[in-house]
């Protein structure tokens, strides 16, 4: 019987564990439909957390789980790490040298594989084997999470530009209105409606 964590518990778990880092964004967790490898069913789940006090000057942190148990060793030999490295994260707002390898930035990537028989690389059960079916499913789950992250980053960029535009308008327009009013010998008009129209709000 497969035992996925589920979207709600993934988000709650990440929020609880990472509370001290105060991330600004939790991408909607992804739970893929069951697939099979070597006759054994498996499910891939993924989540991404971004911003806040997560360090931005180093590689992203990777949280790997198999049947709800954290995988703490042999990260480089694991299918989860390899799938993360193969995705072009530059398209989704993270830095990545040459479009391959572990991305850099203020993010934490979590991947969980639930299976009746997880294909580990060794008896130590520290890394998941890089089988094509598993790599493909991890990649698809990560892309969905990464798209959500990119949407958030685009939204934040638009907010930033709107705020900068508002600051410029607030600074320049009153000065222009005052000079024009002086030249025409009229009182300075109320600019609230004009600023609202310019800002499209």
Question: PLM features: residue spans?
Answer:
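Charged regulatory segments coupled to nucleotide-binding catalytic modules in large multidomain enzymes
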Residues: 51-194
């Amino acid at each position: 019987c497969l035992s996925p964590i589920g979207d709600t518990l993934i988000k709650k778990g990440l929020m609880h564990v990472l509370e001290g880092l105060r991330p600004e964004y939790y991408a909607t967790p992804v739970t893929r439909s069951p697939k099979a490898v070597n006759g054994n069913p498996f499910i891939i789940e993924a989540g991404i957390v971004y911003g806040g006090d997560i360090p931005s000057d180093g590689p992203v942190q990777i949280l790997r789980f198999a049947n709800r148990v954290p995988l703490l060793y042999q990260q480089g030999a694991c299918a989860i790490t390899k799938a993360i490295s193969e995705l072009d994260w530059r398209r989704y707002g993270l830095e990545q040298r040459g479009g391959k390898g572990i991305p850099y930035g203020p993010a934490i990537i979590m991947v969980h594989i639930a299976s009746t028989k997880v294909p580990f690389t060794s008896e130590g059960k520290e890394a998941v084997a890089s089988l094509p079916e598993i790599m493909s499913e991890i990649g698809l789950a990560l892309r969905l999470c990464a798209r959500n992250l990119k949407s958030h980053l685009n939204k934040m960029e638009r907010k930033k530009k709107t705020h900068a535009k508002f600051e410029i308008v607030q600074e320049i327009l009153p000065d222009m209105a005052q000079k024009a009013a002086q030249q025409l010998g009229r009182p300075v008009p109320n600019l609230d409606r004009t600023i609202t129209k310019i800002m499209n709000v």
